Amino acid sequence: MQYIPLKEKYENEIKPAMMKEFGYKNIHQVPRLEKIVINMGIGEGSRNKDVIDIHAKELALIAGQKPVVTKAKKSISNFKIRKGMPIGLKVTLRGVNMYNFLYKLINLVLPKVRDFRGLNPNGFDGRGNYSFGLTEQLVFPEISPDQVRRVQGMDIVIVTTAKTDDEARKLLELFGFPFKR
């Protein structure tokens, strides 16, 4: 199998296949990937600044882009959180970085996930966006297991311009996403 950048694959193979299957009249009606958002919620980050810094470095290695620290919008006494405390990290990938991350996710990361049987096809939100979670950052090739102090999961949201879930599912399947049957 020869390596073809995903952007080229989208232009040359996926667009024509989508036009044929869904009967689009115009090439611009074909759904495309808009962005990928990686979110990492860090519970104890509000009490320990080092935890935020460590996970920010890991997320920067994974995404190839510096993450933004997300802060609490409201105070919640049961969770011991005050308004403005850091509670997580997020990265929004677009363009070349998005396609590079997607390639790495499909070909390197998902095959390394323990007991992986395919992605849940129910992760669509009704508007053509797909969300799923990973339980540990160790499945990424940039993270070495020796240097990880605390295993941390993350949420990944793939935002498309698709109008329906069926269009988005077909788009992601053509990109090579392994959905459960």
UniProtKB/Swiss-Prot annotation:
Gene name, Swiss-Prot/TrEMBL: rplE
Keywords of the record: Ribonucleoprotein, Ribosomal protein, RNA-binding, rRNA-binding, tRNA-binding
Pfam families membership: Ribosomal_L5 (PF00281), Ribosomal_L5_C (PF00673)
Family: Belongs to the universal ribosomal protein uL5 family.
Organism: Thermosipho africanus (strain TCF52B)
Subunit structure: Part of the 50S ribosomal subunit; part of the 5S rRNA/L5/L18/L25 subcomplex. Contacts the 5S rRNA and the P site tRNA. Forms a bridge to the 30S subunit in the 70S ribosome.
GO MF annotation, one: rRNA binding
Its biological purpose: This is one of the proteins that bind and probably mediate the attachment of the 5S RNA into the large ribosomal subunit, where it forms part of the central protuberance. In the 70S ribosome it contacts protein S13 of the 30S subunit (bridge B1b), connecting the 2 subunits; this bridge is implicated in subunit movement. Contacts the P site tRNA; the 5S rRNA and some of its associated proteins might help stabilize positioning of ribosome-bound tRNAs.
Keyword Ribonucleoprotein applies: yes
Superkingdom field: Bacteria
Record carries keyword tRNA-binding: yes
Protein name stated in the entry: Large ribosomal subunit protein uL5
A Gene Ontology cellular-component term: ribosome
GO biological process: translation
InterPro entries assigned: Ribosomal_uL5, Ribosomal_uL5_bac-type, Ribosomal_uL5_C, Ribosomal_uL5_CS, Ribosomal_uL5_dom_sf, Ribosomal_uL5_N
